[in-house]
């Protein structure tokens, strides 16, 4: 009851769950007939936006088509009920019937599965936080000197990620943090600073990477970065002889090696670390199940830092629900240019022009040809085509000494075209290489294409990626989707969008396995993530809430005013939907004011209906925070209805009563009615917003 709850002076803590909504449930890129999920009605097909007028009040609605050609009109103020459908191939996407009970049954079953998954995830989490780890001590002076020798300026996201990692390491609970950022965005510097802190605390560091070439590159970079410090850094890969490997292993075991970088070889059983304190895993998804089990064995009770440019669903699941800590690096280094991507049918003319353009400006070229048996023939073919180029080949079947020599020569610009397999896919960083040509790009996965494209554009020069396919007409459906996706995802910090598109193309079943994914395909990945996060919250708090409570916690705001961005203000539908989505997923007033400024800057002063839209979003935010269930109002007054378990600051509410004593009265135990003659809608909305702010303060 409200009267009882008024006595409780506890303030409600409002959590920021925007991460999943902004990156997984982004509606702004919807296309006509694309599948979409409504929480209460199921999976339909998006049909665009339309303006609906009721009693001279205009609102814009999302139109969703359901089975039997039924249509549902969803006001943009209820966008929180909608999410993109991600889950299975196009032909298998469900289409529900309005008014049919099947959707509720599927949703209920998925919710039960979400609770099962949440229990497993929380068990992992509770095991981790119950472990006693090492609390790293700060070494201010040394650390400051180390940081000052970094030759670049940190981006804000880099700085934030580093601070989060160090904060984790200072705690006695073992760190388990994922740093997610696009290729070339500075994840390695985060790892280096964590490594430095560990070494200062006399702890050993293991850096696990998926490929020999990446291990060699990390070894070179770490050696250069630590050259002013007495830090012993070694590398363990197939580039070393057996004798050298045994020598390194022995030195690790007795503590003479401080940092060991390597492939899966660093998981060998005969490695007995003397004082391992930090494990850094680069591109975790590249390791198989067996290697991941070995990682678990060596990572017990130590801090673990994982770096990735291509997050996978399970990793995202654990990060989004708070089981793993997550840092995102989404801002590029200064002067970094977006890689220009072109799709062309295989053409010798295109290849010659692309190679010549690059080498004539003093640059270098990767030519990806993923058929090792014929790669020598391809080199000869390209040499005839572009005699001006100095061409060599590189692939994983070469002797380790030969491959190391080739990559070293390429790095030092001793030749300018490398015809290679996907061995260069992960992490190789050669700033002078600014053109990549991928032959038979239709045969590569989306994440692979993204990683390969990330090998170029590592400097201030404009970089180019050429995706060559045998035929644009005959390309298979899924391959076309991958090619279309990689060309459309050109913006910086697009790793989350990449993960979503990969889910859309491959389907949940292929990525998570059919046993785990059946219930997800029926409701979509976006909604499943909401159910999972809700389940985790409820289990943590020790209760089970009904399914509908997920939505019922959102207050209903009915103020009888037009609140929309009219097409006379923003003409393009998807631009309006973009801003509607941004407003709907904002979690604080500052974000909403930034949206207001962006709108004014790009489209001019907001019309009244746009101003009301943003203010109503603020009213909804603060109403949710203080436990308001519904607000209904017109020009003569209205009422505020509270949830029974609302926790309101009684003193602040009494202050509001005293300001306008004749304005208020309770008409039920949970409903507070107000009577007031407002001059206009603007005054009324401002009054309601300010009143809620005063109650909350």
Curated annotation (Swiss-Prot):
Enzyme superclass (EC): hydrolase
Residue span, Helicase ATP-binding domain: 168-329
Entry annotated with the keyword Cytoplasm: yes
MF GO annotations: ATP binding; damaged DNA binding; DNA helicase activity; hydrolase activity
Annotated GO biological process: DNA repair
Chief localisation class: cytoplasm
Alphabetical list of Pfam families matching this protein: CarD_TRCF_RID (PF02559), DEAD (PF00270), Helicase_C (PF00271), TRCF (PF03461)
Record keywords: ATP-binding, Cytoplasm, DNA damage, DNA repair, DNA-binding, Helicase, Hydrolase, Nucleotide-binding
Name the UniProt record assigns to this protein: Transcription-repair-coupling factor
Source organism of the structure: Buchnera aphidicola subsp. Baizongia pistaciae (strain Bp)
